[in-house]
Amino acid sequence: MRVISNIASLRDVRRSWQADSKVIAFVPTMGNLHQGHLNLVKEAKLKADIVVVSIFVNPLQFGPDEDLEAYPRTLENDRNVLSEMGVDVLFTPQVKDIYSRGLEQQTFVEVPGISYMICGASRPGHFRGVATIVCKLFNMVQPNMAFFGEKDFQQLQVIKAMVTDLSMNLTVHGVKTTRETDGLAMSSRNQYLNVEQRALAPTLYTRLQEMQQKIESGRRDFSRITSECCEQLAEAGFSIDYIEIRSADTLLQPGHEETNVVILAAAFLGRTRLIDNLQVSLA
């Protein structure tokens, strides 16, 4: 595996792949890799000749009171794991190379509408930061396809919309959420949880499953179903950011003809923000 931190060097390698008509898959990450990330890599390896993984903790997607400085950085271990998996290139750019004119002078990519709702309402500017860095990385790597986890469902929809709107020549694949044995969605931030919080954390997924069962049983009183879940989670010790039932296609409020919805959730245990989602068919 080659480790490349220079954009020009990456482009040189990319040209050689292009000359050989290689199919290139890309997995962008912020590092501190867990099995969820590795499953993205596995999917990429199944579909492409070349797999590129990036590790870049993107300051543009963190709010002023969020965990940019505390975010776990485990580059040496990540490098070893990716090498063992047979990744072709690990791209590790620096902030000064990605944002050469500084964060304030940076050209931004913003996907209107979908970026401002749900998680975007709780974290203003977050999806602008995500769309900007992903667009820049796509321009650098120029992959044929890219892989993202469905755990970050709204992020996945933002990226798909950006790719469509900007006529980018690549396919975006969503990969099923990877969970711990007790159901907790894997996340690099789970390590912030203390012992008591970690024991409680899977309750979020359990409550979403109960919402799913209520909908599948025929209930369509989505507001009441959501309120019931919020009450149960609050009683258990969670601080609710949002629990929403939205169209899986548009993330808008479900219409009468909706066939697929997604339950989206974000809640805090202490200072740790957990997110999860479940898709539900109404057919």
UniProtKB/Swiss-Prot annotation:
The entry's keywords: ATP-binding, Cytoplasm, Ligase, Nucleotide-binding, Pantothenate biosynthesis
Keyword Metal-binding: no
A Pfam family hit: Pantoate_ligase
Localisation: Cytoplasm
Keyword Electron transport part of the UniProt annotation: no
Catalytic function, reaction form: (R)-pantoate + beta-alanine + ATP = (R)-pantothenate + AMP + diphosphate + H(+)
Record-listed beta-alanine binding positions: 61
Pathway: Cofactor biosynthesis; (R)-pantothenate biosynthesis; (R)-pantothenate from (R)-pantoate and beta-alanine: step 1/1
Gene Ontology CC terms, in alphabetical order: cytosol
SUPFAM superfamilies the UniProt entry points to: Nucleotidylyl transferase
InterPro entries in UniProt: Cyt_trans-like (IPR004821), Pantoate_ligase (IPR003721), Pantoate_ligase_C (IPR042176), Rossmann-like_a/b/a_fold (IPR014729)
GO molecular function, one term: pantoate-beta-alanine ligase activity
Enzyme Commission code(s) on record: 6.3.2.1
Entry binding sites for (R)-pantoate: 61, 155
Intrachain S-S bonds: none
Active site: 37 (proton donor)
Biological process annotations from GO: pantothenate biosynthetic process
CDD domains with a match to the protein in the record: PanC
Top EC class for this record: ligase
Residue sites binding ATP per the record: 30-37, 149-152, 186-189
Function: Catalyzes the condensation of pantoate with beta-alanine in an ATP-dependent reaction via a pantoyl-adenylate intermediate.
The protein's assembly and partners: Homodimer.
Family the UniProt entry places it in: Belongs to the pantothenate synthetase family.
Note: The reaction proceeds by a bi uni uni bi ping pong mechanism.
Name of this protein: Pantothenate synthetase
Organism: Pseudoalteromonas atlantica (strain T6c / ATCC BAA-1087)
